[in-house]
A protein has these predicted regions:
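Peripheral interaction segments used for macromolecular assembly
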Residues: 1-81
């Protein structure tokens, strides 16, 4: 799967069923030595959709449980970082 294939997918919290954002608004953290994806960096949004400077949620790759056709399911309760 290419990164462009994941753009626009909704990010859903597995336990709460909450919508956390759209991946097109997120960044990836990549290990420079291996080239592997380490985490998604998802900006948190303020009222009216304006970004809050410097605020983001780091989602380790191991917490991505499923990438479907229109959403990505993440286990936010399983973070050990």
């Amino acid at each position: 799967m290419r990164l462009s294939d994941m753009n626009g997918k909704e990010i859903i919290d597995l336990k709460k069923g909450e919508r956390m954002g759209i991946l097109g608004q997120a960044d990836l953290e990549i290990d420079e030595n291996t080239g592997h994806i380490k985490a998604f960096l998802i900006p948190t949004l303020k009222w009216f959709g304006f970004k809050k400077n410097g605020t983001e949620v780091r989602v380790p790759w191991r917490n991505i449980k499923k990438i479907g056709s229109d959403m990505i399911i993440i286990d936010f309760n399983d973070f050990s970082d």
